Amino acid sequence: LFSEDETPNWPPFHQFDQIIQTRACEGEAFYDGILSPNLTQDERNVVVQSYAGLLCSKQFYHYVVEDWLQGDPAIGKPPPERTQGRNKNWQHLYSRDIISMPDKWEYPWFAAWDLAFHMVPMAKVDPGFAKNQLSVFLREWYMHPNGQLPAYEFHLDDVNPPVHAWAARRVYEIEKESDKPDRNFLTSVFQKLLLNFTWWVNRKDDEGNNIFSGGFLGLDNISLFDRSSDVPMGGRLQQADGTAWMGFYCSNMMQMALELARDGDRHAIAYEDMASKFFEHFVQIVDAINTHGGTGLWDEIDGFYYDQVLLDHEVLPIKSRSLVGLLPLIAVTVIDEDQLDKLPGFRKRFEWFLKHRKDLARYIIHSRTGKKRWLISAVPFQRLQRILIRLLDP
C-alpha cells in the first residue's frame, strides 16, 4: 500500500541488497559500542543473536479486564459466572502498551517476573525501554491497589518471586556505569515498591514471624504439589524459597535506599531511615529462616533448607532436595565503609544495632583485613559448607 504521490521506484526491491548491507553495518557498529572486544567471533554471534531475540519479543498487548468480564455487546452477554471467575479482582487493569513478552510466538502474554529478568540485559541495548517496562508495571493501571503486581493474563492473582526491585536496581547500575544514573527512575520505582513490599509482608507472612509462604513462586514442576492451592493434607505451608526471596527483596530495597540517600538533599535523611528499616528487616528474616521454632527451615540432619507444613501444631518438613532449598543462597548483601562514611544517620543506627542486638548481629560478618565491609547472609558459613556438599555432589 502506498500513497498515489509516493509511487515506489520500479522495479521493486532493486536496492534491497544495498539497504540490507547498510543496516548490517549499522548493527555491527552499534554492537561494537556495547560488546567486549575480547569476544571471539562465535561468542559475539551468540550474544548478538540473543539480543535480537530479546528485541524481537516486543509486542503490542491490549487487555482490559473490565471489558473482558462484561463481554462484547456486539456478540451478546457472556455467561454470568465469568464475572466471578479468574481476574475478577483486577478490574482496574487496563493494558494497552508495547510489552516485552517471554516469547511473542510461543508465550504472547506478559509475565511480570520474566520481564524483570529480561530487562537487565535489555538495559545494555535500550535502557529507556528497560526503565519503561519496569516502571509501567508499577503504575496504577497494572499494580493492584493493595500493592500486588499482576502475574500473567490467565491468573493475574498468581504470586511470582519479588524480583522487580533487583531488576530496577541492576538497570540503574548499568546506566550508572555509563555515567548516566537516572535517579528519578530509581526514586519512582522505590516509592511504588514500598507498596508491593508491604503487600508481601501483610499477605504472605501469616503469623508475623518473618517466615513466608507465597505459593507457586515461579518454579515450574519443582514441587510435590501445586503450591498455589491449599496443602493437600491440610495445614499451612512455610516456604524456604518464599522466605529467601523476601530476604533478597529486603537487601535490594536497602541498597536502593542507601543509593538514594547519598544525594545529600533534604530527602536524604528519609532514605537513610528506610535503609535502616530494610537492613533490620533483612536480619530478622535471616534469623527466622535459621532459628524459628528451633532451627527454622533448616534440617540439621540433612544439611538442607526445606519447605514445611504446619499441621495440628506439628512441623512436617517436605524433604525434597530442589532449588527451593538452595534459594537462601541468594539472600546476601554487603555494606562497606564508604556507604557508612557518607550516611551518618544510617551509620549511627547500624552501630547501635551491632552493639545492642547481639542476638541478631551474629549474622553479620565483619571483614578482618583490608577495606572494612560487613557481609549479611541468610546462610551461615557452617551451613553454607553443608549445602555446597549437596549442590556439588556429583
Report the location of each language-model feature.
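Acidic, mature catalytic/reactive cores of soluble proteins
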Residues: 1-394
